């Protein structure tokens, strides 16, 4: 066990899979955890008088069990036998060959082929927070730095599987970003400027980082260098496929905070059976295309020339259906080229995967020719990035058999004719008996010993056997060596026979050894082609995204948006891209027109019944703007759009009870984040703001927020404001930039029909009781609610809502305890003041001042 403990000491926080013959064994705590996760038998063995827990599984079951351990949140270190056991050696040489963690793996069975598997590192400084992301399975490497809010947004966007932090920052990290992330702590000395910068310079073989555009990002450089150090500790010592480091430049992409990404359901639906936007738009044929599309979606473009470049490419393919279908059929054949290439420098690529690379290179040529002939500039550019790597394709064809096995430990990988020694060994394995017979015949002919035979024993191997009849006739050549005398004759060996014996007995083992040597030479040859192979994968991924957009546009009847410089958003017959795909067969989505600008139509105050479609109208407007700025066509008849630089949403309830925050507190936090980050190119979605508190508090807050948004001089954000507070319709009478709209309904025989059409003017009813009835509320409750509503509306119409003589305005159940009688004197005074007040005569600000006065009286 001494060797085991030495290996375990290298990675004490990982489960150590210790290779013993044909099994991987785990011991002590590792065994208990492994047994629990995998459901395998836990036993004990005697270890010097002490029992130690033991659990293991056959080596060929690693592919099945390893993913379960990693997905359960464990780091796993694999300790392999580095030599074959021999009789004279008690302890076999072993070494740790791989350390797999949630954020560090190239194992296809552990990876979601349509998602990146990012490892992140976060570095705190007094001014900013630095962050770095790397996906070792693809070679992508990013850095950025900024405020806590910005880093939180990046974490929500990139969704790292694991985050590396320094030990002393653990509490701060959890305070800022919560405890839901899988984190790993490194010693503080690693997160230092000098150490991490040296790591980066050494890795990229440069004198400075100016060429990557990250020279001035000192805080995020520390995070990036720490990631490289961490990769080394996981036995990834040569990740040369991480060939560049890129800055996530906030000034190049639309700002969306984590609330917006969640509320717009870009990646995940808020409902278990719902769909997200990525599920609609991702029609990619390759895994690398799907991963790139996700990145485009969370990082929409700001530069109009790049947006138009993508849109024009999509447009050129939408009108050429035959070409589009041909390209998509060809892309489907490539598989995950990006992740295949990443295995080359890590020396973890199999013979069959090398063949896949060769076959992909052969498929590139027709795609390059098609794109080069196309008139679109972006498609021509992608053609120029494709490299056929003919020398590599030729070398693989020379060396690797077309039916090569998946593992190098099995023979049959290297082509016949490539290695003379290998061909001889294969001939020996196939024709060993015939070769022995040839020697027997040749020696019998030379010596005249006609009954000469070749035999074999375990003591001295192959031998020539001469009977007594010939042993004293002087026929035995001098170069024969006598090894054994028997009663029937004598046994001899020759140099030729021993050489053949060595070849025959060691041929199969030598074949595997030689094939491995030749294969490793090929992998070294392939190192020089990693960069062009990566460029091929990136070009194919971008082409895949463009063709996916074109295919989706054709299938879903999307149109190309146009952009203007006058801050106008004018969308005709806009549809929600997700909801329209979820409607029952035969039911059509009701489209709506939207017009927004920074002047007369800055804020649309949208009222209407519950379930009428207000929220859908808000979301579809933002989604259409986002889709356009990632280069996609949009679900509308036409659209004139201005560039949006920030998208904010305050929609839906999102309690954070676990951290002690109520719905209303979360709502106010999200709203405050919006109001503090506005610009004149922002679009803001406010859905039912203020509903988490009392009615008049809610109205007051919503009113004040609408006023604030309208009165901004230089940050006049375009706003869609959905509300059930019909009192807010009065804002349109006071402010030129606010316009009232409502989602229309039709009431027939006391039944509400939702027409889902946005029309000018405010609405006076929410039809909440009708919705309750539709939800299956007991009829007694529905009837009672209608009675109360009727009395409330009658009282309000007659101005008696706050009249102290209207106690019996609503019929009350018997035995009700009068509130005033149960209150202390001070509370009773406030109560009477509230009862006698006509709130309809107060402005929102006066209401808020009155509330503050009451809170002071009540010592709240």
Q: What does each model-found stretch correspond to?
A:
Residues 1-316, 325, 329-332, 336-345, ...:
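Charged catalytic and DNA/RNA-contacting regions of genome-maintenance
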Residues 28-31, 217, 285, 290, ...:
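ATPase nucleotide-binding head domains, primarily ABC-like/P-loop NTPase cores
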Residues 44-55, 205-214, 267, 277-281, ...:
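Short hinge/gating elements
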Residues 78-95, 539-547, 554, 722:
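Amphipathic alpha-helical
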Residues 191-199, 255, 266-268, 359-434, ...:
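Amphipathic heptad-repeat alpha-helical coiled-coil/stalk segments that mediate oligomerization
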Residues 346, 360-363, 416-417, 443-451, ...:
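Charged, surface-exposed helical/loop "interaction arms" that form contiguous linear patches used
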Residues 401, 486-524:
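Extended, charged coiled-coil "arm/hinge" scaffolds of SMC/Rad50-like chromosome-maintenance ATPases
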Residues 827-860:
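C-terminal tails and terminal domains of large nucleic-acid-associated
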